[in-house]
Design a protein with these regions (language model features):
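Conserved beta-strand-loop-alpha-helix hinge in the C-terminal portion
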Residues: 222-244
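Conserved ABC ATPase "signature" region
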Residues: 120-138
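Helix-to-loop junction immediately C-terminal to a conserved catalytic motif
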Residues: 53
Length: 272
């Protein structure tokens, strides 16, 4: 059996050496899997994704990529660093982090040109992507003139153009309308069918079953409290309520009090 693309063994990470963000995380991710990371705000989801992308490094425990132990020193090897950046793509929760060039077109082609891809190949890839994402009319615009949905599409294009084997996405559908959400999910599933490993953090439990074949639930102690198949996680009302992923409503019927878990909706807010 091949090595997992990512393997974490008892991984811990703290900010400033005193604010725990990941506690004893164990996880193996195989090539071609669809992984969802769910949990309340502050539970460690984004920190985990940053670690997988080599933006931060474990304080304790073991972290490997395709069988190679990863540390800050690993990226001092230019050949390894370039290979990793070609194979692993990251889409940030805040698209503005990725969009820093004067125009959308320059943002999309920045990554592959930095990695040494030829201009003709880069242009061909860009043309295909902008058609797929329906962002042809945005190419000459400044990113700061775009809506959040447009920015997310451009950020996704700037990652997909590298053609990574592994795609890591932090809340890719947050704040999007249902049509744009559907478009992005369909694109991600097409990428998975084509062989890509997809790792997504999300609060939108209504997309989890479609975008996952394994789900990891993070609790407020910044550790994995449960992992399993999507249906087993999503049907565990107690688990979701205990980890602030569902409301629990109660009402009295005659002499009994009944409690019901209510899953958060990404595009729906209740007034209480």
């Amino acid at each position: 059996m091949h090595n997992p693309v990512f393997s974490l063994k008892e991984v811990c990470f703290s900010y400033l050496d005193k604010f725990p963000a990941l506690v004893a995380v164990d996880m193996d991710i195989q090539a071609g899997q669809k992984i969802s990371i769910i949990g309340a705000n502050g539970s460690g989801k984004s920190t985990l994704l940053h670690l997988l992308d080599g933006l931060i490094f474990a304080d304790k425990g073991g972290f490997s990529f395709c069988g190679k132990e990863i540390s800050e020193r690993s990226f001092e090897d230019i050949a390894f660093s370039r290979d990793f950046r070609r194979r692993v793509g990251f889409v940030f929760q805040d698209p503005d982090v990725q969009l820093f060039c004067p125009s959308v077109k320059e943002d999309i082609v920045f990554g592959p040109l930095q990695l040494g891809l030829g201009r003709n190949e880069t242009q061909d890839r860009m043309e295909k992507l902008v058609n797929t994402l329906a962002i042809q009319d945005l190419l000459d615009r400044s990113p700061n003139q775009l809506s959040i949905g447009e920015k997310r599409k451009v950020a996704l294009a700037s990652t997909l153009i590298i053609q990574p084997e592994i795609l890591i996405l932090d809340e890719p559908t947050a704040g999007l309308d249902p049509t744009t959400t559907r478009h992005i999910i369909d694109l991600l599933m097409d990428e998975n069918i084509a062989g890509k490993t997809i790792i997504t953090s999300t609060h939108d439990l209504h997309i989890v079953e479609e975008i996952s074949d394994m789900v990891y639930v993070f609790g407020q102690e910044r550790r994995i409290v449960k992992s399993g198949l999507p249906d087993s996680i999503l049907n565990d009302a107690v688990l979701l309520a205990e980890n602030n992923l569902a409301h629990v409503h109660s009402h009295r019927h005659k002499d009994k009090v009944h409690a019901h878990a209510h899953v958060h909706l990404e595009h729906h807010k209740e007034e209480h």
